[in-house]
Amino acid sequence: MLRVVEQPGHQALLRVPAATRAIVSWNAGAPNGGIALAVHRSDGSVAEPLLYARWSPHDRRSLDGSDEKTRVAVDVVRSDVPFSGIGVTSTVALDAVSVAIPPPDDARVAFRARVAPLEVPPLSQTVRGFPESARSWCSPTALAMLLRFHGVDASIPDVAHGVFDSSYAGTGNWAFNAAYAGARGLRGVAAYLRGLDHVAAFVDAGLPVAISISWRGKELPGAPLPHSEGHLVVVRGFEPHHALVNDPAHPAVATRYDRAALDRVFRAHGGVAYLVAPRERTAELVALANNALPVSP
């Protein structure tokens, strides 16, 4: 489930079905800013605002605020009791703010992906002159591929610098990656999807998707690494039994994985995805994100 409010100014309240976990992401053009969140619990109480993030041209950091029932862990809000909304307050006017919660367990979408594979520029996360890139730049590289697909000239080092979270010294903060896409003139959100069938709906609409996966041993045949606790790849198309992906850690980048295996390691890792589109397609992006349907009895 995804909620997006465009041009909310400095504050917004985003209502969602009862949940205990969410990702809040935002788009803003301002070079400096800060975000605080207030969880609106399902019992009608409202938690005290928690600091979520601060950013400036030279430093971006997540802020792990917490109270007795709610905590922020880098880019995920977790609550011990259900909430039905999140209030967002920003020191700068926002272009957009979004709240994503996991879809219900009985949600599904019909597999489609009838279109030809999308022409997503293949980029490797191993960048000469940046020794840290090979082991840790999958997220900014995947985002750079999405940006270039949409006509934004983005270098991998620039993206890595723009999404770096100094609190945990990494480039994989989901909200920061969405914010960077927004700062480059696109609409970027971090969302929960139901699985590869859900991803296929975006591919059908001409929108590649970056998905977060993890695996061990033989869970993902053909993977470039024996295991990963978190890795980003871009899904650009489908064959009957395979997903066509750009894997920034793969020697060839453009490769394919068994669709069922990739679906399992995607859903097991939470089903988080980067959704990037032109701003004028925001409503369509939200509609696609929310098209999971209850399974018929």
Where are these regions (language model features)?
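A short beta-strand element within beta-rich, extracytoplasmic domains
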Residues: 17-30, 86-88
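Aromatic sugar-binding surface patches on proteins
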Residues: 59-74
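Short coil-to-beta strand junction motifs in C2/discoidin
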Residues: 30-36, 229
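Short beta-strands within extracellular/lumenal beta-sheet-rich domains
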Residues: 5-17
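Conserved active-site-adjacent core of cysteine acyl-enzyme catalytic domains
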Residues: 4, 153-296
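Active-site-adjacent structural segments surrounding the nucleophilic cysteine of cysteine proteases
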Residues: 69-71, 80-171, 223
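Noncatalytic regulatory segments and standalone regulatory/sensor domains
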Residues: 17, 36, 40-56, 60, ...
